[in-house]
From Swiss-Prot:
GO molecular function, one term: phospholipid binding
Organism, as annotated: Bos taurus
Region (Interaction with NUPL2): 656-698
Family: Belongs to the GLE1 family.
Protein name: mRNA export factor GLE1
Gene name of the record: GLE1
Region annotated Disordered, chain positions: 63-122, 336-377
Its biological purpose: Required for the export of mRNAs containing poly(A) tails from the nucleus into the cytoplasm. May be involved in the terminal step of the mRNA transport through the nuclear pore complex (NPC).
Name of a matching Pfam family: GLE1
PANTHER family xref list: GLE-1-RELATED, MRNA EXPORT FACTOR GLE1
């Protein structure tokens, strides 16, 4: 409101006036009589008046104008009036003892043209005023002294703090410098260490470089020497090959010349009335053989020693053939001469008979000639004991199948799962058999042995055991034997070296679990009857497909497999059988004999030589069997073995050759060359892939 604003203005004006600036003692009533006594007493000078006269009045006189002198006298007369107590000049800071000192220096700055008049109070008031002024002065002096001391202390503290900060800064700088120096030293040490390491590494690299350079130079020299040696060997090989090639051409020329002599002997056929076609046929075969060797040689480069030996064998046979032909011609000539003599004698007798009609005519009986021999054929049937053994194995296999028929034909899902797990546990380890390492082969053997022993094994992330089903053991034994034979039929047929690791595991399992071995033989005889050896006979009323299956052929959709594939499978199974009979598990009991050892291999070889050979089959199986097992049989039977080899060469080869067509001569020639090489070196080589002692340490 407007009135409220004016009220504040009034109060502000009163506060700014002289009375508004006066100091009032609110406690004057407490003093009571002292105040009244002071007012009633006569004025007298205070003991401090001298100080006032000395310090205050001179300043007033200097500053007051002349016109104000009378006013001062008037004011002194008013000292007795207690009602008029003006403000003491000592209250003014300009006239205080402390401010007097400062006013001298700043006189012009604080000097005022108008000075208030000094009114003297009563002596007691002056005393009080002087005490107050004295106290104030002392207080100010003490305050100034305290302030000075405080300032000095603060300055000392500031100096101390400054010195301490300076010292700390120095220490900090020293520590920082020390840290930098230490870091520099560490860095220098690291650099020196790195430099030393780099120098050491450089020296090491230089040494390695020198060593490698030395090795490289040695290798280069060795390579150069090897190259020169290879060049020399290649030159010698070429020279030998060219010499053998020239020899082959000379052999071919001689064979052709002998063949022409065989053809020239055809003129004796009508004259002597003998059949010489067999000699010509065999001569043509030998010419074709030599021509084939030379043709193969021209494709492959130079002839080998085996090629030369085969050609020389053909030449020798051609010479023997021509010699036999000449002997046959001589015998025929002798026979013709004797017949002519006999005819002449008969004619003479007839002429004599004509002269004597009573004599009876005698008709001559033709002679068979000295070269005629009775036909002695080998047997086609297996021995009774072997056949009985074969039938016993097949019956045991059939009984095993019947034993797990419930598990095999079960419709229960749990039983099917158990059957599948058992089959995987039995067959997968056999599929993993390889020549990687002996330790790996031992792990596979231990897993199969544990499974057959009833212990749980891990298969497909699950624990499997034959104890899960009463028929589990029969099922596992049958499937395991079947898988071993299947590996021979497939894996060994493709990779001949695989026969040995599979055979050694099968032999070890056979030794610990004889029933598995019997089932292996049963499966082997069923798929490859020649492993008995057994040539199934065709029975009346038997379907042709069934007979072909009995012979070992695979028949699918009335289609019989190719002969090459059939021979390949038979070869794989015979190789597996030949490896089994000579190998034993190295970690087994050496005190016991082999469950199916080399004596069975000798029996097989003897029995197959006592049977009529089959075209292409007998030669293939004999070669595979002897290549795998020949070295072991040679060490076991020694002289008897070499007699057997000579028997094959001299007596059995002609029988195989007689039934082998020209398109099936490959297996026969391969067998013949193998045996001739063995006879030439008097040793059967160790088969490729045979497991040595170092394999079992891997």
């Amino acid at each position: 409101m407007p009135s409220e604003g004016r009220c504040w203005e009034t109060l502000q004006a009163l506060r700014s006036c002289d009375k508004g600036r006066l100091c009032y003692d609110r406690d004057w009533l407490l003093r009571g009589e002292d105040v009244l006594q002071e007012c009633m007493s006569l004025p007298k000078l205070s003991s401090y008046s001298g100080w006032v006269v000395d310090h205050v009045l001179p300043h007033i006189q200097k500053n007051a104008p002349p016109s104000e002198t009378s006013a001062s006298s008037v004011s002194t007369s008013a000292l007795d009036q207690p009602s008029s107590v003006p403000r003491s000049p000592l209250r003014n800071p300009a006239y205080s003892p402390v401010s007097s000192a400062t006013s001298n220096g700043t006189k012009d700055k604080y000097e005022s043209p108008h000075t208030e008049p000094v009114v003297l109070q009563s002596p007691r008031g002056m005393k009080v005023e002087g005490c107050i002024r004295m106290y104030e002065l002392v207080h100010r002096m003490k305050g100034a002294e305290g302030l000075r001391q405080w300032q000095e202390e603060q300055e000392k503290k500031v100096r101390a703090l400054s010195e301490m900060a300076s010292e700390q800064l120095k220490r900090f700088d020293e520590r920082k410098e020390l840290k930098h120096h230490k870091e520099f030293q560490d860095l220098r040490e690291v650099m020196e260490k790195s430099s030393r390491e780099a120098l050491g590494q450089q020296e090491k690299l230089k040494a390695e470089h020198r060593h490698r350079a030395k090795i490289l130079n040695l290798k280069l020299r060795e390579a150069e020497q090897q190259r020169l040696k290879q060049e020399e060997q290649e030159r010698l090989r070429k020279e030998e090959g060219q010499a053998r090639l020239r020899g082959l051409y000379a052999l071919q020329e001689e064979v052709l010349h002998l063949s022409q002599q065989l053809d020239a002997s055809d003129q004796h056929r009508d004259l002597l009335q003998v059949d010489l076609s067999a000699f010509r046929t065999r001569g043509n075969q030998l010419c074709s053989l030599v021509s084939g060797i030379i043709r193969a040689t021209s494709e492959n480069g130079f002839p080998t020693v085996e090629d030369q030996a085969a050609a020389e064998g053909a030449l020798q046979e051609m010479r023997d053939l021509l010699s036999n032909l000449h002997q046959e011609i001589r015998r025929a000539c002798e026979e013709k001469r004797r017949r002519d003599e006999e005819e002449a004698r008969i004619k003479q007798q007839e002429s004599q008979m004509q002269q004597r009609p009573e004599a009876h005519k005698e008709l001559p009986v033709p002679n068979q000639g000295p070269g005629a021999k009775p036909n002695e054929d080998l047997q086609m049937k297996v021995q009774d004991s072997t056949m009985q053994w074969y039938q016993q194995l097949q019956e045991a296999s059939s009984r095993c199948v019947l034993a797990f028929e419930g598990l095999s034909n079960s419709k229960d899902s749990q039983a099917k799962k158990i059957k599948m797990d058992l089959q995987k546990a039995a067959t997968i380890p056999v599929s993993q058999i390889s020549t990687i390492a002996g330790s790996k082969l031992k792990e596979i053997f231990d897993k199969i042995h544990s499974l057959l022993s009833g212990k749980p094994v891990q298969s497909g992330g699950r624990s499997v055991s034959v104890t899960l089903n009463p028929q589990g053991l029969d099922f596992v034994q049958y499937k395991l034997a079947e898988k071993f034979v299947k590996q021979g039929e497939e894996e060994v047929a493709s990779h001949h070296e695989a026969a040995f690791p599979i055979a050694v595991v099968a032999s070890g399992i056979w030794e610990l679990h004889p029933r598995v071995g019997a089932l292996i033989l049963a499966h082997l005889h069923k798929k490859c009857p020649y492993s008995v050896p057994f040539y199934p006979a065709f029975k009346e009323g038997m379907a042709l497909e069934d007979y072909q299956r009995m012979l070992g052929y695979q028949v699918k959709d009335s289609k019989v497999e190719q002969q090459d594939n059939f021979l390949k499978r038979m070869s794989g199974m015979i190789r597996l059988y030949a490896a089994i009979i000579q190998l034993r598990w190295p970690y087994g009991n050496r005190q016991e004999t082999h469950p199916h050892g080399l004596n069975h291999g000798w029996r097989w070889l003897a029995q197959i030589l006592n049977m009529e050979p089959l075209s292409d089959v007998t030669a293939t199986l004999l070669f595979d069997f002897l290549e795998v097992c020949g070295n072991a049989l040679m060490k076991q039977y020694q002289v008897q073995f070499w007699k057997m080899i000579l028997l094959i060469k001299e007596d059995y080869f002609p029988r195989i050759e007689a039934i082998t067509s020209s398109g099936q001569m490959g297996s026969f020639i391969r067998l013949k060359q193998f045996l001739e090489k063995c006879l030439q070196h008097r040793e059967v080589p160790v088969p490729k892939g045979f497991l040595t002692a170092s394999f079992w340490r891997s």
